[in-house]
């Protein structure tokens, strides 16, 4: 079988409650700093202020698609920065995901955010093609998956794949509280809602060399699967969907065991149970499956932004020489059943 075209990351951008760029966000995560705080005015069903992680650089009065775009703009531009010194003009395909449709975030939200963000980015770069989806937690990784396919099919030279999410609409917070998903002293298995955006600029290794760009990481593989036994239902999850996503990923992967795992587990028991079963379904593929990182402990649950933000954590570790393993696995799961996983290798593997 012919060798597939190598996909590489040549730019990343991040904006989180911990920092307004990838470097500061990664440093805060590494130091274990938490941005979780009391909401200024929202009260939960126990009479306590809701625990959230918010972007303090954006006024709380800014809401809806406009808030999401304001969060997304700077990290998108950061991810594109490498093209500013490229040898020639480049055209970029934007693939964006937001959170799933929910109270406070109606149908059409993703399309609105995408259109507004495209308009802002068009002042700096030529955008061609792409798309948007309300993909939920797995959405950012789903964007990376589709970007890899787009690049390998020769439909674009560069893909800007990203996710942006914000849970801080009052209607959304009330809905989470009603569903017993908010973390509090009275509900230890809930999560702390956050807001963030993350982006990755992807291309083939051939194009990167043509443009004189230095790869930051190699995308060793990307996979998508579906889970039928979903959260907030009467069914029992046995890790079939996530286990399949891992299996698809490992089919064409190096035999080396995964040494670093970053995921979107957020305190909900469902996610922990699912991961445990998924690992059992893929024996021998992890150095230590119990040694995983959950950034939501620090920057809150950031939904669709999770995957691209995980990529930025690894690029920062590589850049500062504290990445200790050649293979990293990042994964996330949406409430709609979508499961996505990406396997990343260091820049040396792409050379």
Segments from the language model and where they lie:
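Conserved "HGTGT" condensation-loop signature of ketosynthase/thiolase-family condensing enzymes
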Residues: 1-136, 142, 149-155, 164, ...
